[in-house]
Amino acid sequence: MKPNVQQVKTFLMQLQDDICQKLSAVDGGEFHEDSWQREAGGGGRSRVLRNGGVFEQAGVNFSHVHGDAMPASATAHRPELAGRSFEAMGVSLVVHPQSPFVPTSHANVRFFIAEKPGADPVWWFGGGFDLTPYYGFEEDAVHWHRTARDICQPFGEEVYPKYKKWCDDYFYLKHRDEQRGIGGLFFDDLNAPDFDTAFNFMQAVGQGYTDAYLPIVERRRNTDYGVREREFQLYRRGRYVEFNLVWDRGTLFGLQTGGRTESILMSMPPLVRWEYSFEPKEGSPEAALAEFIKVRDWI
């Protein structure tokens, strides 16, 4: 049975609407939409909320691109895809809050299909969500991972541990030997047991992101902070930039397929700083972050 591509696209566009609506309700600000077309085929809707009451920048992007040949980043680990036409669609978002006590969050759900005449289509879903705190709170991490586990539960006991580990492995800065944050879920190449089940799981992850994130935002948004906390937040945002530009497959795929650069780099924090050989003061809350983001079972 050929996957229902239109059904997936309809869901993704609705998901973008829903997430923007919920983030706006929390922030009080509005998203500004930029619709764009891709010369080689496809296009998308980029929505950005800037300098809001809670979020310094929140970007929620929908894209649907297609082409006659696969880019190198996609065929590197799937050589059988070379020479096929493809369609890729997804919703990708990153939220950078004003307050250092509210973590940055990222979520993504996507669908990919590659076809050639006389052969069965090759398709899969991917996605997940992950959390990057600047100051660690155990109850937030537990809530985040408990929500992730509850999303996975109906699809099998083994699903959460498998995709949690994949997330921990993926969001790792090899050159720093540290995690990007406390993880969450990450899955890719999902095409089993059948289209409907895989699609249902992708929907559950996409819809579950706000359940995981917004209670944490509400809990931390009014915590007082000063220059020290803000400086540390900007310094740690540097790790986000490093990961996205050096290790992230999605960024590479977007740039190699001639995607819209502004939308691809929408995940970048609006302000960031680096400091040579920075060492937080021993025993400080800033120093505690290194231990907090180490891989562990939160629930």
Swiss-Prot record:
GO BP of this protein: protoporphyrinogen IX biosynthetic process
Listed EC numbers: 1.3.3.3
Site (Important for dimerization) residue list: H175
Catalytic activity: coproporphyrinogen III + O2 + 2 H(+) = protoporphyrinogen IX + 2 CO2 + 2 H2O
PROSITE patterns referenced in this protein's UniProt entry, alphabetically: COPROGEN_OXIDASE
Superkingdom of the organism of origin: Bacteria
Family matches, as Gene3D superfamilies: Coproporphyrinogen III oxidase, aerobic
Subcellular location as annotated: Cytoplasm
Pathway linked to the protein: Porphyrin-containing compound metabolism; protoporphyrin-IX biosynthesis; protoporphyrinogen-IX from coproporphyrinogen-III (O2 route): step 1/1
Region (Important for dimerization): 240-275
Enzyme class: oxidoreductase
Function: Involved in the heme biosynthesis. Catalyzes the aerobic oxidative decarboxylation of propionate groups of rings A and B of coproporphyrinogen-III to yield the vinyl groups in protoporphyrinogen-IX.
Family in the record: Belongs to the aerobic coproporphyrinogen-III oxidase family.
NCBIfam families noted in UniProt: PRK05330.1
Name of the molecule in the record: Oxygen-dependent coproporphyrinogen-III oxidase
Organism ancestry: Bacteria, Pseudomonadati, Pseudomonadota, Gammaproteobacteria, Enterobacterales
